[in-house]
Amino acid sequence: MIAVLRMLNRGRSRAERVRARLVAAGAAVATFLVCTAVSLADYKDEGGSLTGLGLALLAVPIGGLVHQANRLASATRERRLAALRLAGATPGDVRRLGAMEGGSLAVGGSLGGGALYVVTHLAGPLPQVPVVVALVTLGGVLSGARAGRHVVASPLGVARRARVRGPRVRDLLLLAAGVGLFVLGAVKKGDFPLAGPYGSAVSVAAGLVLLLFGVTLTTTWMIRGYARWAGRRARSAEALLAARLVEADPRAWARALAVVSLTVFFGAAAGAQQAGVGYSQGHALLDVALLVALATSAVALVVHQAEELIDLRRSFAALAASGVPERALGGVLVRQAVIAALPVCVVAAVSGVAVVVLTLTDVYQVQWLGWAVARAVAMAGVGVLAAVLVALAARPLLRGALVFETRA
């Protein structure tokens, strides 16, 4: 199995090599940030806790960027795995090869990030380093094992045309568990029942991870429902087409907007907290982390737009050939972004304020709600604006897809 993996690595394309470097670098940066965030759990002051939370938040968009890097050359990887299946490899062999490939990249990057943390924190706590390295490596193994899930079912590509999976009721449980762990760790802090401050940090980190997946799965409900509502009330062909396209595949939009929704959620929650305690250096670092998360989510949206244009290029080319102007097709992209992002950002902003207010019900004052609501509205607007700007920036991709399909 190792010999086969080495042979496949020697035959990797340039896109595959770029993807491998991005995955390893992302694993290294995520390991360093999480180790640093856990080490700050020892500080009793509010600034240290907020700094640790900001660093933990920085690891979330980096994880999303690693996921998008895995998607950059997914078609090439699936062709290689499909060739192995046709050559006689079993589904288990394909899964093991994918797990070994993803695990090797993750363990190399996480060891590099752990070594960097040890060098820069010789006097700081070190017990969390092997735990974080193991968790990051495990994530790489699971991601690699899932890479060939299409070709395991059908090496000829039949599974790629399967019906898009819709939202499920059990997706809500994941979101509830994430909110519960995050609130528990944030409220208890140093008095956490298990392992004290380290247990609190682990609870917050686990809550963030579950929130990331829970928001991705749960927002599918909101996006599909709002798209259906917008389609029934559409007053133009552009709005109707955009609503129907979003309704046809809400999970893809939920996946692309996951980091955006988390950015809006934590931005609104931070604003609700600032209204009571004032603005500190820890809040400044938290805002920087949110800006980085928003920029990273914009990259994820660009990748999503490119993938969608590749899938819909024939339909768009047929519309263009029938006389629909390119500007109108670009308007469809913008309307899609608004339909998908608006409900997600609004619900995320309201949820962020609600979590803080409900957690601090005994001490929270009514006059603080003014700043909290203003910050929530601003964060929701920034999230929708980011999606719209990405859609406007994707118009050259639309033009290229139309030209390519016309020549073909």
Predicted features by range, described:
Residues 98-99, 155, 333, 402:
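A general structural motif at alpha-helix termini
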Residues 72, 151-157, 228, 232, ...:
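Perimembrane helix-loop junctions in membrane proteins
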Residues 133-162, 384-408:
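C-terminal membrane-exit region of the final transmembrane helix in multipass inner-membrane proteins
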Residues 27-45, 53-76, 91-124, 128, ...:
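Transmembrane-helix bundle segments that line or gate the permeation/cavity pathway
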Residues 71-85, 308-320:
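Intracellular coupling helices
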Residues 2-8, 14-36, 40, 46-47, ...:
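Hydrophobic multi-pass inner-membrane translocation pores used for secretion
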